[in-house]
């Protein structure tokens, strides 16, 4: 069981300008916003197949990782980082998009399956375990018509947020940062409760 002492915060996404600000890259967006807040830059680390940055949350130092693999190969970077930094599986937190959650909804969970997400699926395969923490960030479903949902999934996740959606996501990512601070200051239970609560008018 995790104590909330996350040494590695990893966001999932696809590398390259083609995928910048797409729904599937909201995990990257969370880390980029956190790095911007802390005025730090990412640098490529070829040994872990990803871009890394160092930040401080409260009095504690943390590492941010954006895999330079494509989404479906995220596990290669995550597993390499765990070995390189000599971490335990309960010391990592994965930020990932979830189209089964309404836009703006957050869901923190320790353990569980991939939920059909190929990035999580690859991480589970490489680690040989699903007992890691993940923060799912809701991007909303592609269509209310479930009959053509599968057909619209790829265009949806690789599409960009519109102006109204972007405003919601900005508030959500600010809430993610606040949630990490709550975890550092008050512990995982209170932090999880904060993250899983609905957005309010005062958020962001």
UniProtKB/Swiss-Prot annotation:
It catalyses: an N-acyl-L-alpha-aminoacyl-tRNA + H2O = an N-acyl-L-amino acid + a tRNA + H(+). GO terms for biological process: protein quality control for misfolded or incompletely synthesized proteins; rescue of stalled ribosome. Disulfide bonds: none annotated. Coiled coil: none annotated. Keywords: Cytoplasm, Hydrolase, RNA-binding, tRNA-binding. InterPro entries: Pept_tRNA_hydro, Pept_tRNA_hydro_CS, Pept_tRNA_hydro_sf. The record marks 14 as: Discriminates between blocked and unblocked aminoacyl-tRNA. Its EC number is 3.1.1.29. Belongs to the PTH family. This is Peptidyl-tRNA hydrolase. The lineage of its organism: Bacteria, Bacillati, Cyanobacteriota, Cyanophyceae, Synechococcales.
